[in-house]
Amino acid sequence: MIKSELVQRIAEHNPHLYQRDVENIVNAILDEIVTALARGDRVELRGFGAFSVKHRPARAGRNPRTGEHVPVDQKSVPFFKTGKEMRERLNRENATSEASA
C-alpha cells in the first residue's frame, strides 16, 4: 500500500472528512515522526510500534565491481520495532489464512 492508497482508505472510512484533509493529516503525522527522529527522539505508537534511529559506525567496505576497499562513513538509519498488539494480530491473521488454505 502506498501513501495515496492509505489516504483514500481513511477517507472512505470517514465520509465526513474530505480526502484533501485526510492527506494533510497523514502528511502532518509523517512529518512530525521524521522531525522527532531527526532530533534523536524515539516515537512510540502504542500497539503499533516504535520508530527510532540507530547509529552505524564508520567501517571499511568493498566495491563489489572492483574489489577495492573503500571507507564507509558513519550514518544514522531509521529503525522500526513492531508493537505487541501488531505482532499478535499479524500472527493471528496469518494463522487464520493458513488454516483456510
From Swiss-Prot:
This protein is one of the two subunits of integration host factor, a specific DNA-binding protein that functions in genetic recombination as well as in transcriptional and translational control. One of its GO terms (biological process) is regulation of translation. Heterodimer of an alpha and a beta chain. Signal peptide: none annotated. Belongs to the bacterial histone-like protein family. It comes from the Bacteria. PROSITE patterns: HISTONE_LIKE. CDD domains: IHF_B. GO terms for molecular function: DNA binding; structural constituent of chromatin. Keywords: DNA recombination, DNA-binding, Transcription, Transcription regulation, Translation regulation. This is Integration host factor subunit beta. One of its GO terms (cellular component) is chromosome.
